[in-house]
Design a protein with these regions (language model features):
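C-terminal beta-signal and adjacent terminal beta-strands/loops
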Residues: 623-624, 628, 680, 730-744, ...
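Acidic, small-polar-rich N-terminal luminal/periplasmic segments of exported/outer-membrane proteins
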Residues: 57-194, 602
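Periplasmic-side early beta-strands and strand-to-turn transitions of outer-membrane beta-barrels
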Residues: 200, 214, 221-317
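Surface-exposed extracellular loop regions of Gram-negative outer-membrane beta-barrel proteins
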Residues: 294, 300-307, 353, 455, ...
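Outer-membrane beta-barrel translocator/receptor signature
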Residues: 146, 159-168, 173-247, 254, ...
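Outer-membrane beta-barrel signature, preferentially recognizing the C-terminal barrel domain
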Residues: 309-336, 467-471, 526-542, 546, ...
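Gram-negative outer-membrane beta-barrel transporters
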Residues: 487-488, 492, 618-622, 626, ...
């Protein structure tokens, strides 16, 4: 049994930031100076009025809390009302006004791989629903390189959320595995979110349209209170198509096509909750959530390796389905006098399916020896199915004590949490062929003793197989948190968490699942693939420390130290593959170590009746990044006269990386010094970071300098509101786009994005709502008002994903015209009607 542990103890070893970082920060000083110029006069005016207001001042991007506690440093919280106002259609819309957060795009089949923050993305940023981690992406180099798998992250409908919490920076103490760069947590709605105070029931309906991708949204539901019971039921449906951007020209089969692949999708989601509250101390609740997303596409821009298709048709057709069902039951006890202030227990079960279907008609070139012409003979249809099933079961117990007074050491609240979870993962592949007789010389084809006329269907053959046995991963986590008030103005949080992971497989099914690979390799010597049973133990310690000094409501300063880790997922660590043509190997690596991250962050916040502000500076260190290593093996076969060289790839722990950056946000309320401007507010948010790996390569997930400036006016009694945003999308410096590539001979190359690809852009959005009476709200927005053609860095860096990287030189040669299908949306309208009863 293998046994490995890692401890985040190198936090304070003083890693040196390269001097080049300092030289490149001049470009951001102007932004910081502008914020300070706006901030200083407002602060001086506000100090005299700080006790005269009861209004809550929130930065829309970052909620500023001036309470006497250690606040959540690096936290962005979007409320349900903010989500309604901004009308997000997907992950991209959810973070469009958060310059410090991006999205991860798969580069194939339109999949969203999750979020990007603090220089990392996808599986390195955890996603949770009500604090329960969601499945990560289980993908491998074989399927991702040809776009043959459903590589999207299971999404959550934001309209079913009461709030969305985005915690930037290493967060494994709270979220566990995968929170290297942060966590995105969706808090689901409760019955009281739909019920107006004083009523016993409520209902909600929403019909919306978003021109970005021709999205039609329908939402409906209701909630009720009856005696000690609370009930909620919500359902959503979304139908849409591919992004409507600046793609142009004729749709052709070409990796650099200027047209986007046609896509249609439908997504349904349901949320049901039932709670029994006998008194103020006890609460029982049951919850059910389900989401089913189906997407159909014609793939014109990714060429399969094993099919010759006809001109005028796509390379292949695809159908992807993402389905998840989640059920949970919880109990909560609260008391104002007992030693245990709060006791919470939760049982959770979830099953998720990620299915990908790919099919194409394939042809054989037929050359006329007399005139040299070539025709294509239809040889049949080929289907490839790939299915992944992920089952999660979880038990969690959490206990909070009342305040414990320790004299000069202050008051302490302790939290103890333990979690046990079990993940079951399995994948299956099915290849189906429907061949057609295509022997033009004889006019017939003999197959398995039967004669088929030219063009006749010759039946169906199917092969089912898997590259991995079903795998189980058990996780036990124990954490202790001390939330201490050392004085009225000084607070401290200290937390420590330990996670144990035990991974095993179903070895009894080895012959059924992986036997055919063993058959292919039985005579190949030197290709060391590992088919032994899996029995692996890994462990990790996570830490959290927050020291907050809050002398005034208008000035709070906090320092945060936190760590993160990510245990290699199943496909990364155990997937292995052998291809006879082209000949290459994918080798597993059972010795992979968990990835680790360390976050240091200093944050200054404050609020008055005139403003709310936030400035955060951070340094992140990452270690043991898991990346692909390519090489060549020398293998032999008994019937071969000489050895041959066989290319291989495998995952290894290779790079370390570091990142420095800042986030800033400011909200101004000019009516504090000019009552005539009541209802007017000004906002601005900015972010910049720069990172580099130990190999000298850039951290491509790092967002370039970005920001926005907003102007809002809210009418009396919040009956109507209009918002205007100017968005600044600055170009990524060429020096920060360095990455590895390989030439045709397999030699490593260092590349950078062409300067012509990297351009600044400025866009404008206007969105508003108007309430008709107390039950109806009209919402509308126009985005990219001046129809600006531009790319965000998230659009460009998907060229380095496995499905596109092998052809990136074609994009570089063709120039910006080859990027048309990756552009951001054209000017579009978003509108909705809401009814609240």
């Amino acid at each position: 049994m293998q046994k490995r542990y890692h401890i985040h103890v190198n936090a304070l070893l003083g890693q040196v930031v390269p001097a080049s970082f300092a030289r490149r920060w001049r470009c951001v000083f102007g932004v910081v100076a502008l914020l300070l110029v706006l901030l200083c006069p407002a602060l001086s005016h506000a100090q005299a009025h700080v006790n005269d207001t009861t209004r809550t001042r929130n930065i829309k991007e970052v909620v500023v809390k001036a309470n006497r506690g250690a606040r959540a440093v690096g936290m962005i919280k979007q409320t349900a009302e903010q989500l309604k106002v901004e009308m997000p259609a997907d992950m991209t819309d959810l973070v469009r006004y958060m310059p410090s957060v991006g999205v991860s795009i798969s580069g194939s089949r339109g999949g969203m791989r999750g979020f990007a923050m603090r220089g990392v993305e996808a599986n390195r940023v955890a996603i949770s629903i009500d604090g329960i981690l969601q499945p990560d992406i289980q993908d491998n180099v074989v399927f991702s390189s040809y776009g043959l798998s459903n590589a999207s992250r299971i999404d959550f409908d934001p309209y079913l959320a009461s709030s969305v919490e985005i915690q930037r920076g290493a967060n494994s103490f709270v979220s566990g595995n995968g929170a290297l760069g942060g966590t995105v947590n969706y808090n689901t709605k409760n019955a009281r979110d739909l019920i107006v105070q004083g009523k016993q029931w409520g209902a909600f309906a929403h019909v919306g349209y978003n021109g970005k991708d021709n999205l039609r949204t329908y939402i409906g539901g209701g909630a009720a209170l009856w005696k000690h019971w609370e009930a909620l039921l919500l359902a959503t449906r979304r139908d849409g198509n591919e992004l409507r951007n600046f793609a142009y020209g004729q749709r052709t089969r070409n990796i650099t096509s200027t047209q986007a692949d046609p896509i249609s999708f439908a997504q349904h989601a349901w949320l049901a909750k039932l709670a029994y509250v006998p008194n103020e101390h006890h609460r029982l609740d049951w919850a059910f959530y389900a989401m089913n997303r189906k997407a159909d596409a014609e793939i014109w821009t990714l060429e399969p390796i094993d099919a010759f298709t006809a001109e005028g048709k796509p390379y292949y057709y695809s159908h992807d389905q993402s389905l998840t069902r989640q059920a949970s039951m919880g109990y909560r006890f609260t008391s104002d006098v007992a030693f245990v202030k709060k006791l919470a227990a939760r049982l959770h079960y979830q099953v998720s399916y990620l299915d990908a279907t790919t099919w194409t008609d394939y042809y054989r070139p037929n050359f006329d020896q007399h005139n040299g012409n070539m025709t294509l003979l239809h040889e049949g249809k080929r289907d490839k199915y790939r299915a992944q099933e992920i089952g999660d079961a979880l038990v969690r117990l959490s206990l909070d004590t009342r305040k414990l007074s320790l004299g000069a050491l202050g008051q302490h609240n302790l939290n103890f949490t333990t979690t046990a979870s079990l993940r079951n993962y399995s994948s299956r592949n099915v290849d189906v062929e429907n061949p057609v007789a295509a022997n033009t010389i004889d006019g017939y084809t003999v197959r398995r003793g039967k004669v088929y006329a030219l063009g006749e269907n010759m039946g169906t053959t199917a092969q089912a197989y898997a590259f991995l046995n079903p795998i189980r991963r058990f996780n036990l986590a124990v954490s202790l948190l001390d939330d201490a008030a050392l004085s009225p103005v000084l607070n401290l949080k200290l937390g420590l968490r330990y996670d144990l992971f035990h991974t095993t497989d179903d070895a009894d099914n080895q012959a059924r699942n992986t036997g055919y690979i063993a058959y292919l390799l039985q005579n190949v010597q030197g290709a060391n693939m590992d088919f032994s049973p899996i029995n692996n133990v890994q462990g990790g310690i996570s830490a959290l420390a927050v020291l907050a000094f809050t002398p005034k409501s208008w000035f709070n300063v906090a320092y945060k130290f936190s760590t993160g880790y990510r245990v290699p997922n199943i496909e990364e660590q155990y997937f292995q593959y052998y291809s006879t043509w082209p000949s290459f190997l994918v080798m597993s690596n059972r010795d992979l170590k968990p990835e680790k991250s360390i976050n240091h962050e200093l944050e200054i916040t404050g609020k008055t009746n005139a403003l709310a502000y936030m400035f955060s500076a951070y340094y992140n260190h990452y270690a043991d990044f898991i990346e692909l290593r390519q090489g060549v093996l020398t293998v032999s076969e008994p019937l071969m006269s000489q050895e041959k060289r066989l290319a291989y790839v495998t995952n290894v722990n290779r790079d370390h990386a570091h990142l420095v950056g800042f986030d800033a946000a400011l909200q101004l309320y000019p009516d504090a010094w000019c009552p005539a401007l009541r209802g007017v507010s000004l906002s601005s948010a900015w972010s910049y970071a720069q990172g580099e790996s130990s190999s000298g390569m850039s951290m491509l997930s790092v967002q370039p300098l970005a920001g926005n400036v907003g102007l809002a006016y809210t009418g009396a009694n919040s009956r109507w509101e209009v918002n205007a945003k100017m968005n600044f999308h600055f170009a990524k410096p060429v020096s920060q786009t360095t990455f590895w590539d390989r030439d045709a001979a397999g030699r490593d190359l260092i590349r950078r994005f062409p300067a012509a690809f990297l351009q600044n852009a400025y866009t404008f959005d206007i969105y508003a709502y108007y309430k008709i009476g107390t039950h109806i709200t009209l919402r509308a927005g126009v985005y990219n008002l001046f129809d600006t053609q531009y790319h965000r860095w998230d659009d460009l860096r998907q060229l380095t994903n496995p499905a596109l990287l092998g052809n990136i030189n074609l994009f570089f040669k063709d120039g910006r015209k080859s990027l048309a299908r990756f552009t951001q949306p054209r000017r579009y309208l978003s509108a909705a009607v809401e009814i609240n009863i």
